[in-house]
Amino acid sequence: MWWLAALFYFVFICFSESRASLLATTVSVLVILYDNKRIRNVLLSRKVLVVSIPLILLLLYLIYRFKANSANGRLLIWRVSFDMFKEKLLFGFGPGGFLAHYMDYQANYLSDHPDSPFLLLADNVNNPFNEYILVLVNYGIVGFCCLMASIVAVFKRLLLLDEEKRIILSSCTVVLLVVSFFSYPFSNPFVWVVSTVIIMIVLFESTGKKSGLLAIPISVCSVTGIIISVLSFLPEREWQVISQRSLMGETETVLPDFRRLHERMKNNGSFLYNFGAELHYSGYFEESLQILEECSSYLNDYDVQMLLADCHQNLGDTLTAIDCYNYASRMVPSKFLPQYQIMNLYLAYGDTVNAVNAANAILAKDVKVSRSKAVQRIINEAESLVKDVMFHSR
């Protein structure tokens, strides 16, 4: 029955098209097999190694080729993240540092490498798709070494458990560690719960009679964690409710609720962006600009820059609006809208030369995917402007 269940699970993973899950499952199975001494000796034999190493390399290549653009996009993220890591080696940017600064570094990297093959793959990014890189960027070498020391300590304790518990907990831990190389499982609260349960079981089971000494500090930490989670969940839940009401057409009604929540969630970039967007939608451009500038300290991406640009545009600050549109275009060069807005701003002020420059920038872009109607309309307008200017200049 176990083998049948495992087969169904493997088929499910394949159909889910999750490369990280497939790789994690494969490694987890190898860990389970490796725990058996007889199987371990077979796996480590020269004949098996000679055959298995090329197969493993082939598997990794096939996993890469399965979604090559997605994989290359992650390579770009990791490359830019390395630039961030070099900037603050020891202690990193602090909690939320990646989210606050990554897009600035991506904009600089792509500006410095205009012929990069990654240009069309660049997009809005809020996570490096690698928990280890996230730790390096946010907490530097010191934080990363603490993480590695904790992982090693857990595995040392795992080896002290009886065979059945050791196999189950080791395979679960390995799955989490492997998936963390290619995704962001720890953004899910459930994964934190599972990880905490694994650590507590390992600590209590491996210490035997000494486990009573660990009960008090672990219980205190667990209760403290639960209290902090609940306290942070309450405003999140209230925010979710008023956001839903806003989507149902009650934006003006819920703006006072957003303002009230602002004091409690002023360090949450996603909340600040949502609040700024609601103010922008309702026409409160000055207040929206203020909130979005706060937001850029915690979350600064293409969408934030586009909203900032539109606020400046509506407040009559054309030059700053153009700067924001240009910065948004540098962040995600494949987007057509920033240069389109710049083209229209210059046209509105009678600056035909710069309007044509923006139009040519639009026409020079490669299309990331098949053209949507909106993109095709932008291209048509840019072509029409260039043709009109060329015709009248004769």
What are these regions (language model features)?
Residues 46, 141-168, 324, 337:
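Hydrophobic transmembrane alpha-helices and their immediate junctions
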Residues 1-61, 197-205, 215-220:
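Hydrophobic alpha-helical segments of polytopic membrane proteins
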Residues 95-137:
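Interfacial juxtamembrane loops and adjacent helix segments
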